[in-house]
Amino acid sequence: LDELTDQGKTIIFITHKLGEAMHAADDVTVLRDGENVGSVDTDDATREELAELMVGREVILETDKAERPPGDVVLSVDDLTVTDDGGYDAVADMNFDVREGEVFGIAGVDGNGQSELIEAVTGMRTPDGGRVVFDGTDVTDRSRREHIERGMAYIPEDRQEEGLVMEFDLVENGLLGNQHTDPYADTGGIDWGATRGHAEDVVSEYDVRPPDVEAEAHSLSGGNQQKFVVGREFSRDPSLVVASHPTRGVDIGSIEFIHDRLLELRQEGKAVLLVSSKLDEVRQLSDRLGVVHEGEIVDVVDPDAVTEEQLGMLMAGEEPTSVPQMAARAGTGAPAGGGSR
């Protein structure tokens, strides 16, 4: 883009990403709810001012993560090996655990085994070796339904392919994953009154717009689709949340909202496994951060101390000169990561 502007070209650049807008544009015009709400010169405006224009209220861009000692282990991944659809090892002998009141982050360049790892952890792909232990039970070969019934919530990487049925309305989409559980289902079939009430609660609590549970999922913006998926999953009162790229393709206001909800669960003592390719996201939210490269956790680092340059080198499979390590976990005597270094 810089080369094109140097050649005298005029560029119209459309994005909902705050950083991109501030970096790439000279002037930014903000559209909100279909209306022009203002224009700013990026040399004079701050990120906070632009975010407020975009959302219509003050947005907290820096996440405040309260101190909280972790509790017992909720999820253990032991020597896990998973092959991809082509028969190649996407995950190789991976080890880590996630504890109560902890966000364990996974950082890496997309395509380094994250998708296959999440599928194995959530019961959607059978591993080729190793174990997944959830709340003390080996669930390696258990169904997705059993994972849900045991208290695992899942925010999928692709909300439109895995999280929603786009032709269903929000009442029907709110039932997904709950179709076998009380109070939404019993021996007589689906209780549509309870199901509708559940969808209305999610729409209200998570500020899904438009606030119409009869709206079909495809009619919602990406951010509102994601907020509905997050609300449905969190409403299960899970002991573990597996969040795969939870803010991909959503606006800055929705990002703030989802981050706040994840940290609220952490503060309540829930365990969170977070996978994201956004370095600022995993660094802000995680208590410990596992870095993956070619299907292996190459290191587990302190997200508050590691630099973006060090993370980038680890993600590329290179060895930084010095990386801040996590201390041994209380009560285990084990290193914090369980990675391969």
What would you call each of these model-derived segments?
Residues L1-R341:
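Glycine-rich phosphate-binding loops of nucleotide-dependent enzymes
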